[in-house]
């Protein structure tokens, strides 16, 4: 009977765990839908700013913004690492941190030191364990990222590049592909490539065959400067939004897998309990029959 009591205790424990994982799965599914909506809503803004900046840059070809000038001579490299603040999201953080570590080794092989910005608690902890130089960080963004919370940390990297202190700035995050798939990516944020700002005049452009004619206040250079900063900030925000959509998707999938595994364990324990109970009943019946035969 002690064995049966122990099995009953295990069944109850796993059932309680399954209730928790099932609830977390439902919460993650709800948050995932909202995160995907924010991610999709952020894309048109960055695209529009890029298109306007492209046309304005072509209107002032003699001016080259610092973000579009290479700093090859600098011995340091900027790096923005986007991760989650919480765990229980499968191997999502592990994958992007593994890719980041590989990139760090590659940069080290080129004689570059890394000056990093961490967005998310998991990434900050990782960088601290590596004893990497963390120049800025932002954690506890919550379920809804706000650009004003990111600007301060990101501005540190932008200023370092504008001042020629870093040769490039990289951005690492988890790209949302679909609910079942998320992939770690590392993109070069700065310097901006000229291809990004080639003026488009085709059906894919939001304003095809349109003549752009602006009156600049105070002047075109100032407006371009401001637009390019906004564009880079929008790229970082888009990465954070994609990372959050990936987080909720990965968490939902992980909690569903945990719930399914818990159900399998419960079924196996229930089978063991039934076998133990059957054996105990058979033993009692055998003892009764044996006693009756002795009488």
UniProtKB/Swiss-Prot annotation:
Record keywords, A-Z: ATP synthesis, Cell inner membrane, Cell membrane, CF(1), Hydrogen ion transport, Ion transport, Membrane, Transport
InterPro entries: ATP_synth_F1_ATPase_gsu, ATP_synth_F1_gsu, ATP_synth_F1_gsu_CS
Principal subcellular localization: membrane
Annotated GO CC locations: plasma membrane; proton-transporting ATP synthase complex
GO MF assignments: ATP binding; proton-transporting ATP synthase activity, rotational mechanism
Topology in membrane: Peripheral membrane protein
Biological processes annotated in GO: proton motive force-driven plasma membrane ATP synthesis
Database matches in Gene3D superfamilies: 3.40.1380.10, ATP synthase, gamma subunit, helix hairpin domain (1.10.287.80)
Subcellular location as annotated: Cell inner membrane
Assembly, per entry: F-type ATPases have 2 components, CF(1) - the catalytic core - and CF(0) - the membrane proton channel. CF(1) has five subunits: alpha(3), beta(3), gamma(1), delta(1), epsilon(1). CF(0) has three main subunits: a, b and c.
Biological function: Produces ATP from ADP in the presence of a proton gradient across the membrane. The gamma chain is believed to be important in regulating ATPase activity and the flow of protons through the CF(0) complex.
NCBIfam families in alphabetical order: ATPsyn_F1gamma (TIGR01146), PRK05621.1-1 (NF004144)
PANTHER family in UniProt: ATP SYNTHASE GAMMA CHAIN, ATP SYNTHASE SUBUNIT GAMMA, MITOCHONDRIAL
Family of the protein in this entry: Belongs to the ATPase gamma chain family.
Protein name as catalogued: ATP synthase gamma chain
Organism: Paraburkholderia phymatum (strain DSM 17167 / CIP 108236 / LMG 21445 / STM815)
